[in-house]
């Protein structure tokens, strides 16, 4: 299985976690997912009244230096860690 296929598998698998990840973990996953699928941030930062979108944008911006492949690998690792923490794999 190639990296892209494994990434896509884990992007689906994360939806089956027994408990919802923390907000911090969700933001990490969001940033890595966007970096892996879109690449570097290509939008302007949302305004101060849209906090949710601003946090998501910041999470994406935080991983901007990673290649798509690095982001995919980190995403897979994070999903595996979340399943281990939840006690199921």
Curated annotation (Swiss-Prot):
The UniProt entry, under PROSITE patterns, shows: ACB_1 (PS00880), ACB_2 (PS51228)
Against CDD domains, the record matches this protein to: ACBP
List S-S links within the chain. none
**Which annotated residues bind an acyl-CoA?**
30-34, 56, 75
The UniProt record lists the ACB domain at 3-88
| Gene Ontology annotations of biological process type | fatty acid metabolic process
**Pfam families the UniProt entry points to:** ACBP
Coiled-coil stretches: none
Q: Give GO MF terms, alphabetically.
A: fatty-acyl-CoA binding
Superkingdom of the organism of origin: Eukaryota
Ordered alphabetically, the record's keywords are: Lipid-binding, Transport
Q: Where would one find the signal peptide in this protein?
A: none
Q: Which family does it belong to?
A: Belongs to the ACBP family.
Q: What does this protein do?
A: Binds medium- and long-chain acyl-CoA esters with very high affinity and may function as an intracellular carrier of acyl-CoA esters.
This one is known as Acyl-CoA-binding protein
Supply the source organism for this entry. Answer: Gossypium hirsutum (Upland cotton)
